[in-house]
Amino acid sequence: MTYQAPDENGFYGKFGGRFVPETLMKAVKELDEAYRASKTDPAFQKELNYYLKEYVGRETPLYFAEQLTAHAGGAKIYLKREDLNHTGAHKINNTIGQALLARQMGKQKVVAETGAGQHGVATATVAALFNMECTIFMGEEDVKRQSLNVFRMELLGAKVVSVKAGSRTLKDAVNEALRFWVANVEDTHYIMGSVLGPHPFPEIVRDYQSVIGIEARKQHLEKEGKLPDAIVACVGGGSNAMGLFYPFVDDVSVQMHGVEAAGHGLETEFHAATISKGEIGILHGAMMDVLQDENGQILEAFSISAGLDYPGIGPEHSFFRDLGRAAYHSVTDDEAVEAFQLLCRTEGIIPALESSHAISYAVKLASQMRPEESMVVCLSGRGDKDVNQLKERLEGQIND
């Protein structure tokens, strides 16, 4: 199969598209044109590759997790170490690319939303690097949960706006960031943090994150002489997963597994499992699976991990699900916390809570596979930002 999506209108099957007010249509089309031009511009690509190597620190290692593999008792588990990027997560792969695009369009200001704060930090970082003015919108709840990242963004020169509307989380931060963009569209570029939003954002973010899968594919071939049997990544909006999945999409022997946040359980109201529990709707400029009530009102997503509690999911993930190309699963808060501790103790790596969801499912999956098989898990970020939150939760049981 040769996979080609999106179509010229930005649709992935019935998902995606461009549902934006007239005031943004010009900006979105301008972005589309600049992005298409940049793909065939050798100077742009050279500069992008320079910053990915010299500033971000790519390529990231593909690490054989020997002890974790022994614990699972099945397939070999390789970790794609996106936690080793500058700023500690995969987010910067995308913000570097979009900042260069903004500069090419002559825009000196950037705006972004953030949940866990990782995308905010990555945006503030590239804004400092390229001397741009930066405004970050963050839900008030997330500001409390991730106060360290707020301070980091301010250190980097960004203005952080705490959003008090709605559920005061990521969804509301996106709403406010989009409003801000509408009002300042002439000199401001919106750096979308995931494979979400109106076309061409899902495609742009996918392409900048695809460096994950391109490297992992090459590295696994070098180490094992074959492609992995499975690849696994956590899914909130879904950019680290799409970055890993997309370069493998035509390799049908490779199973692709996305892992959503089940929060307190799918049977409760407290989860962020959009693919499992969502229905098609329009959110933030695109048609996607959305958590909604019977009246079409957007529900609040819930997860211990601030980076996964988004009530929608990138349109291409829903398309993969419909095609049967990827399978989507969910992992509860408790299971993620258990996997967090497991990776700390088996490999000496403190993972982000987001990535811990992928680790949890990967260990289960590996145990059902044969020792001669192998998998790649995207370790999308490091867990420094989560240690404080987990300290409160685990105090007293850590040495039990």
UniProtKB/Swiss-Prot annotation:
Pathway involvement of the protein, from the record: Amino-acid biosynthesis; L-tryptophan biosynthesis; L-tryptophan from chorismate: step 5/5
Positions carrying N6-(pyridoxal phosphate)lysine: 91
CDD domains the record matches: Trp-synth_B
GO CC entries: cytoplasm
Statement: the UniProt record of this protein carries the keyword Amino-acid biosynthesis: yes
Stored Gene3D superfamilies: 3.40.50.1100
Needed co-factor(s): pyridoxal 5'-phosphate
Reaction catalysed by this enzyme: (1S,2R)-1-C-(indol-3-yl)glycerol 3-phosphate + L-serine = D-glyceraldehyde 3-phosphate + L-tryptophan + H2O
EC number annotated for this UniProt entry: 4.2.1.20
Signal peptide: none
Gene Ontology terms for molecular function: tryptophan synthase activity
Keywords of the record: Amino-acid biosynthesis, Aromatic amino acid biosynthesis, Lyase, Pyridoxal phosphate, Tryptophan biosynthesis
Enzyme class, UniProt record, top EC level: lyase
InterPro entries in the cross-refs: Trp_synth_b_CS, Trp_synth_beta, Trp_synth_beta/beta-like, TrpB-like_PALP, TrpB-like_PALP_sf
Alphabetized SUPFAM superfamilies for the sequence: Tryptophan synthase beta subunit-like PLP-dependent enzymes
Record-stated family: Belongs to the TrpB family.
Protein task: The beta subunit is responsible for the synthesis of L-tryptophan from indole and L-serine.
Description of how the protein assembles with itself and partners: Tetramer of two alpha and two beta chains.
Name of the molecule in the record: Tryptophan synthase beta chain
